[in-house]
């Protein structure tokens, strides 16, 4: 099976996200905090007349929070008609993956385990394939 994957860095790790889940890649400039929102919700931002709920991917994994920056790279995904921006450290490339998704055969931190769909081989490296929906749900989803 051939699948296009977006390679990004989150919490210092190179990971893959299926491009079918990705609407666009953007640089976020303005971020408005949301009082009493979950810790992994970094705030709200506007993009082409749409309001995006911005998710701190590091916090969503339960690994602290992303370093504050004036401009942040983000992946825009749409879930049930609601647009979200997932903050990432870097966007690397879109690659074609011809192999099947393999099960994870190593111990992962609970946050990574919750979002892992499996591992894929990209240019000789094994990368964790993550589920954007699970990342948006945040660390509270682990307790449920």
Identify the meaning behind each predicted range.
Residues 1-144:
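An acidic, low-aromatic, low-complexity terminal/linker signal
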């Amino acid at each position: 099976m051939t699948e296009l994957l977006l390679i990004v860095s989150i919490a210092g790790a190179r990971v893959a996200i299926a491009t079918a889940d990705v609407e666009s890649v953007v640089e976020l400039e303005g971020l408005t905090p949301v009082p009493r929102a979950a810790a992994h919700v970094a705030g709200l931002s506007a993009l082409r007349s749409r309001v995006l709920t911005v998710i701190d991917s590091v916090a969503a994994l339960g690994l602290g929070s992303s370093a504050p920056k004036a401009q942040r790279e983000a992946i825009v995904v749409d879930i049930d008609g609601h647009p979200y921006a997932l903050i990432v450290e870097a966007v690397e490339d879109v690659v074609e993956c011809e192999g099947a998704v393999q099960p994870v055969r190593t111990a992962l931190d609970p946050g990574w385990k919750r979002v892992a769909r499996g591992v894929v081989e990209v240019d000789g490296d094994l990368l964790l394939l993550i589920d954007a929906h699970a990342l948006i749900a945040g660390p509270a989803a682990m307790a449920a």
